Amino acid sequence: MFRRPMFRALLATLVALTAFTGAWAQGEAPTQSFTASDGVEIHYLVEGRGDPVVLLHGITGTAASNWGAAGIIGRLAEEFQVIAVDQRGHGMSGKPHDPASYGERMALDVVDLLDHLRLQQAHVVGYSMGGFITMKLVALAPDRLMSAVVGGAGWPSPELRDDAMFDALAASLEAGKGGGPLVEFLWPGEEPPTPEQVQAIGQAMVASNDQMALAAVVRGMAALDVTAELLRINKVPTLNIIGSEDPLKPNADALVDTMNEHRLHIIEGANHMTTLSSPEFLDTVRAFFIELCNCA
């Protein structure tokens, strides 16, 4: 028996997001694509006008499920040109099964996208996995960024990475058993999930995904590491947003005394599942952009 009403809410949310993503894939929102420099097809959506803002979703997500369902695409598109990406291994984009096709390569996709759209610079907003990719992009191509927003993530360093969890997650995905280890790691509250909860939510997370591609994404995560030396010389204005109850908060805290041009905003009471849908998340991002352009 499932012990928590929260379980039903989490599962219902995942099912709804899967349906939302499926509707987008069937053409209810306009999509475009280009071929990245290594030959992988990348799909993206563009809405609005103004300074460009690239949105990078989390693992198992899509542009629609992370950003569309939360209303962030629509709200930002009122003031900015929003470019929401289905990252490789996800959604409508290509899904190679080689870990070498991920990691740093996922950050370079953003550079390729900007080149494809003939944009010299853009704001980049990433959440969870997308946040770690944004950190890598800050290190790799700072001249292409107007600013960076790192949500639900922080410093992707070897010391803070949970290699055991990533290994277990990759093995689970390779066996076709879903994202259970990630469910256990991100589960909010002190009471752990039941095996039934882990199984149900772990399978719902990957219902519309290629599990072998996701496993390759996970095995490529180590290539997102960023050195302290690069963080100390950073010149890209960087906003880090994380929930006070997010298990990845130590990654965010570690940036405070290390990263130049960095500020941390904590959403009190929010966890990894609720931060993105909090009105405070979007309000904080919007205020950051307006401050940078002095256009309030």
Can you say where each PLM-predicted feature lies in the sequence?
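Catalytic active-site module of serine/aspartate enzymes centered on a nucleophile-bearing elbow/loop
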Residues: 265-296
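Gly/Ala-rich beta-loop-alpha elbow adjacent to hydrolase catalytic centers
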Residues: 126, 130, 134
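Flexible "cap/lid" loop of the alpha/beta hydrolase fold
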Residues: 135-139, 147-176
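Short beta-strand/loop motif that positions the catalytic acidic residue
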Residues: 234, 240-242
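Conserved alpha/beta-hydrolase catalytic His-Asp/Glu region
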Residues: 159-164, 177-230
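Conserved HGGG/HGGXW glycine-rich cap/lid loop of the alpha/beta-hydrolase fold
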Residues: 40-92
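Conserved alpha/beta-hydrolase "acid-adjacent" motif
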Residues: 247-252
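Active-site loop/oxyanion-hole signature of alpha/beta-hydrolase fold enzymes
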Residues: 74, 84-122
